[in-house]
Amino acid sequence: CHTRRQRQMCIRDRDKEEHIDFLINNAGAAWAEPFGAFSEGGWDKVMDLNVKSIFFLTQELAPLLRVKGTIDDPSRIINIGSIDGMNVAAFETYSYGASKAAVHHLTRQLARRLIDENILVNAIAPGPFPSNMLGAAVAHDYSEIAKRNPRKRIGTPQDMAGLAIFLCSRAGAF
């Protein structure tokens, strides 16, 4: 949902809902090109989807999050960042790392702004896990990336799901 038209499509059914309990901003894209050839279009595509869409979709859906959020059981927003927003990636994905660093900072700003409205905002910054995006970069051979991890493996969808469930549950309300 990185353009105004796409955001409108994402929220077209918003009026059918009385409230939402949580929002998970999980859309993301990467772009890899050598430094000297890195295109403005690739940069903009990544920044628009990874950062801009999070802000504007959150802005549009905040009224529905405010409805049921209480001091004891706030509504939740989870933004999916990346370790590449904190570390320098091995690939020439300049806009990806910058966008995920922006997601982490935007998360802190939104958390500060929305807490008084009983909306908690957190980010998950996963390491590598099987995905079309990473798979394309490594020809779906994750063995070298796994070797760089102290656990000698890459993450799984269940690793991410467990944390998201915790953050959206009553256990993550404080």
Q: Positions of the model-derived regions?
A:
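Alpha-helical segment proximal to the catalytic Tyr-Lys
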Residues: 63, 112-116, 173
